Amino acid sequence: MAFNDLLQQVGGVGRFQQIQVTLVVLPLLLMASHNTLQNFTAAIPTHHCRPPADANLSKNGGLEVWLPRDRKGQPESCLRFTSPQWGPPFPNGTEANGTGATEPCTDGWIYDNSTFPSTIVTEWDLVCSHRALRQLAQSLYMVGVLLGAMVFGYLADRLGRRKVLILNYLQTAVSGTCTAFAPNFSIYCAFRLLSGMSLAGISLNCMTLNVEWMPIHTRACVGTLIGYVYSLGQFLLAGVAYAVPHWRHLQLLVSAPFFAFFIYSWFFIESARWHSSSGRLDLTLRALQRVARINGKREEGAKLSMEVLRASLQKELTMGKGQASAMELLRCPTLRHLFLCLSMLWFATSFAYYGLVMDLQGFGVSIYLIQVIFGAVDLPAKLVGFLVINSLGRRPAQMAALLLAGICILLNGVIPQDQSIVRTSLAVPGKGCLAASFNCIFLYTGELYPTMIRQTGMGMGSTMARVGSIVSPLVSMTAELYPSMPLFIYGAVPVAASAVTVLLPETLGQPLPDTVQDLESRKGKQTRQQQEHQKYMVPLQASAQEKNGL
């Protein structure tokens, strides 16, 4: 395609691509921290009721005389006796009786601060009857991510990738910092929602800006690099959270660096492909010549002119006369088909992913250890995914990742709750497959949608992912009906979604489409190739039958 030839002319993968890709993906280290930050800032330590203020523990015995026991013999977290309960005359005279009347924790709670000295749970007592508020905070963050995917995906197609990224960095820095100083839970949730919005824009535009500056043969490498940076961010979160256990300090530490990202983002070069798709040929020429100078291809850049670009990018200029809206995804049959299929893939991946990663305390092992393990499994999983993406194609990679993830989660549902090692061993490969699925779907979506609506399509796909992440915590409530019910649901959805991939075209080695006509011509070309393949196979089968005497 013409634009890919222009990229090769100005240096292909040169100094500019190396610098800009590095600077654009660097914030993703901390984006991973924000997405699962509440595993640590909202961790629930062991707790029990505080005895009445007038209770004289030294006179009335130990704390246990106020605390009923659960089935496992541990103190109840949300109930206390209305009066001290004395059992039969044991030698120490302090054996608690579990048959007395109980009441809620009207005087508050006592928390075990040995592992988590300070969380939003301990600061605002988000336990027992207020336990749902903890999950509400994460759901509101995901609502913000959903809104950000819709708003900033659309704005990026209208205003450009660079401008939206600059705005997103500033919004993340300000809202994240304000979250660290939130005086109450309501304000905390409001700023978390704003952080989610801006981080969604960063995620979308990071992928698109990088892919649009890269030649065809390097796009999969860039997508995999972005996935690895996100995985490294999970390692970073485990280490930082262990070193900084106070939630306000941790929140500030993962938010303040976005001020630096905001400052250097002014030096990014806007996508020349977006300029051409918007009909701004002068800005396209200026961007390409600037990249040529950075890549040491000054002479090749000087050969470019308005006439050369006008001849090479005639299709983009024609397309740029009108901007496509989000409604075009439903109005156009070809785009509608892509939108519905990709929406299912985005939803299933995010739904199952957050069902696993936001319940680290449910595995019965150290929360810091499981965070490291979940980050570590991404490395081999994404490497295998990269090899499959580049050798077999995007479609089989996407199908295999979702199918294997679903199977692992379904198997986990039949393992007894007390077998934490076995359950963790099944959850880890499932999480790795979902991480590989995220890696693939980002790249696959960007390659399927045409330039005129690519960012809007990415935004709508991410929107469906956020719907999955919002619904996921609600599904966990079905554990009250049957403990393994959430896992069965988390596993069934990606298995069903894996079948949808057969309805999508392969993009391996294909140029990025700029218009809907490009999509239709590519579909027609692949159909003709399949027909020719079938015609070729029929004589071969007939010949084989003749040889066998059939």
UniProtKB/Swiss-Prot annotation:
Keyword Protein transport found: no
Tell me which GO cellular component terms the UniProt record holds: basolateral plasma membrane; plasma membrane
So which stretches are on the Cytoplasmic side?
Answer: 1-9, 157-164, 217-224, 270-337, 390-395, 445-455, 506-550
Q: Where are the Extracellular topological domains?
A: 31-135, 188-195, 246-248, 359-368, 417-420, 476-484
**Superkingdom of this entry's organism?**
Eukaryota
Give the family from UniProt: Belongs to the major facilitator (TC 2.A.1) superfamily. Organic cation transporter (TC 2.A.1.19) family.
* Its job: Involved in the renal elimination of endogenous and exogenous organic anions. Functions as organic anion exchanger when the uptake of one molecule of organic anion is coupled with an efflux of one molecule of endogenous dicarboxylic acid (glutarate, ketoglutarate, etc). Mediates the transport of prostaglandin E2 (PGE2) and prostaglandin F2-alpha (PGF2-alpha) and may be involved in their renal excretion.
Q: What is this protein called?
A: Solute carrier family 22 member 6
**Organismal lineage:** Eukaryota, Metazoa, Chordata, Craniata, Vertebrata
Give the gene that encodes this protein.
Answer: SLC22A6
